[in-house]
Amino acid sequence: MGPLQFRDVAIEFSLEEWHCLDTAQRNLYRNVMLENYSNLVFLGIVVSKPDLIAHLEQGKKPLTMKRHEMVANPSVICSHFAQDLWPEQNIKDSFQKVILRRYEKRGHGNLQLIKRCESVDECKVHTGGYNGLNQCSTTTQSKVFQCDKYGKVFHKFSNSNRHNIRHTEKKPFKCIECGKAFNQFSTLITHKKIHTGEKPYICEECGKAFKYSSALNTHKRIHTGEKPYKCDKCDKAFIASSTLSKHEIIHTGKKPYKCEECGKAFNQSSTLTKHKKIHTGEKPYKCEECGKAFNQSSTLTKHKKIHTGEKPYVCEECGKAFKYSRILTTHKRIHTGEKPYKCNKCGKAFIASSTLSRHEFIHMGKKHYKCEECGKAFIWSSVLTRHKRVHTGEKPYKCEECGKAFKYSSTLSSHKRSHTGEKPYKCEECGKAFVASSTLSKHEIIHTGKKPYKCEECGKAFNQSSSLTKHKKIHTGEKPYKCEECGKAFNQSSSLTKHKKIHTGEKPYKCEECGKAFNQSSTLIKHKKIHTREKPYKCEECGKAFHLSTHLTTHKILHTGEKPYRCRECGKAFNHSATLSSHKKIHSGEKPYECDKCGKAFISPSSLSRHEIIHTGEKP
């Protein structure tokens, strides 16, 4: 068996046959010949360019070529090597199948095969589709073979034989690099690009490169907005048929892929594979920029955009930009109010399927992920990861504007809005806007009047569980958060954070109206109401109005006469915790609030504020 040459895998047309082809068919021929050649080059079988390929690349007719001109310089790889790559079939047949396969992809109605012509006058185009394959012979094959399983038609026995391998479990084409096997040679060729890193298909719109032309075609639909694959059940549309196929499983409710470790079931095997890495702790995908590792390649791809800062997806409604198209799609629902994902247990609806999935765990009550440091258990591994930062003190997310660092990226995102003034989450009831959706959710409970969280100690009720947790510390006297500067302790971490600014003197929040600066954004917001004279909080008992809801709450106690805050030192009772805190300083002699002008110290910030008016001459 001699050395393999390009002419062994080339398809030839006579002059009469060439004239029978229309423009699209001639282009198809050119593409197939060029593809056959590139595949041989890829395998190292062809070492020089045949004249036929040079002519085709220049757009010339192949008819000017003679048979002997197709011969490339002899290859050092003989066809014995080729037979090892193609067990049970000849390399020539493997490439000659491409023309027929390409025609089949054009669809039944558009399939046109050329009959053998005796002369130009007798030449006819056969358009009978698959049913007519038995009635004619093509330019390259003379017999017709049919698949017993699905009736697919082939013009060579080897092509038919190769097709039948698909119905068996045989995978004769093995990758030398990693050992992975495939049932088609073309799939092996495609697979090899993973090892070479070759990405020859580039998007003209954004410059992104792909290994496969099909992936590029799918990607282009992101820019055009085209979603040709539509679900018959819910009308949801997708850019790729594979995504539609995965989506359709949701409607069946089937979850055949079950995790042996925790029993969780999935509707896709790929999702189960990803899930298993949670249990193994495997993170094979590492970021070259920062060294962070991930258990999924898609997560690494998403992560890389943090370093590039790329945000190509912009909301037409508010101008906000996003790294990923799916996040933009979810974001748009904030503006439309659409919440398509509903919980079957409690009826609560969500804008994202991921939020619904997390919510559903609440009903299950399972907490698989336990903190080794404190024993606290969590429903999700991601929440455990975030929780661990409480113990380590790690704050990896830093604000470029003011340098403040945060434990969580979501907290940084919300914080940034304090600099921009952006408040995208608006209450439909009163029009009040917020920087975070969670703050809006908490606020909305105020309008319902519900206070489901009740203190067993004093009977006081709250509309948020977190508020009850904070309140309970008043009764226990627990103050776990201590200031390293002065030793003062607090029952809330947020109170300690606010307190620390007293020592640093930092006042990053400035009023544009009068120039007064504050160490907390919330204090600035409260202050601004002095200029607007806005008093939205009104007492139902006496009609008195207040700038702040906290002032109204404090005021209401005057009507009830309630004094739940008692000093352990002298037994005196107060209706506000802040008043009790100020009172305690009388016993301790502590005066932490000092006047910058004269050095006089006070036990409370309000006393200092009143004193400072002496220096300014301000008459409120």
Curated annotation (Swiss-Prot):
What's the domain of life for this entry?
Answer: Eukaryota
Disulfide partners: none
Major location category of this protein: nucleus
Leader sequence range is: none
A Pfam family per the record: KRAB
Please state every residue range assigned to the domain named KRAB.
4-75
PROSITE patterns referenced in this protein's UniProt entry, alphabetically: KRAB (PS50805), ZINC_FINGER_C2H2_1 (PS00028), ZINC_FINGER_C2H2_2 (PS50157)
A GO molecular function assigned to this protein is: DNA-binding transcription repressor activity, RNA polymerase II-specific
- UniProt keyword list: DNA-binding, Metal-binding, Nucleus, Repeat, Repressor, Transcription, Transcription regulation, Zinc, Zinc-finger
Q: Does this entry carry the keyword Metal-binding? A: yes
Zinc fingers (C2H2-type), as residue ranges, are 145-167, 173-195, 201-223, 229-251, 257-279, 285-307, 313-335, 341-363, 369-391, 397-419, 425-447, 453-475, 481-503, 509-531, 537-559, 565-587, 593-615
Of the GO CC terms on this record, one is: nucleus
Give any single GO term for biological process.
Answer: regulation of transcription by RNA polymerase II
What SUPFAM superfamilies does the record tag this protein with? beta-beta-alpha zinc fingers, KRAB domain (Kruppel-associated box)
Name its cellular compartments. Answer: Nucleus
Keyword Transferase applies: no
The entry assigns this protein to a family as follows:
Belongs to the krueppel C2H2-type zinc-finger protein family.
Q: What does this protein do?
A: Transcription factor specifically required to repress long interspersed nuclear element 1 (L1) retrotransposons: recognizes and binds L1 sequences and repress their expression by recruiting a repressive complex containing TRIM28/KAP1. Not able to repress expression of all subtypes of L1 elements. Binds to the 5' end of L1PA4, L1PA5 and L1PA6 subtypes, and some L1PA3 subtypes. Does not bind to L1PA7 or older subtypes nor at the most recently evolved L1PA2 and L1Hs. 50% of L1PA3 elements have lost the ZNF93-binding site, explaining why ZNF93 is not able to repress their expression.
Q: What else is known?
A: ZNF93 is only present in primates and evolved to repress the primate L1 lineage until 12.5 million years. Evolution stopped when the L1PA3-subfamily of retrotransposons, that escape repression by ZNF93 through the removal of the ZNF93-binding site, appeared.
Protein name per the record? Zinc finger protein 93
Q: Which organism is it from?
A: Homo sapiens (Human)
Query: What is the gene name?
Result: ZNF93
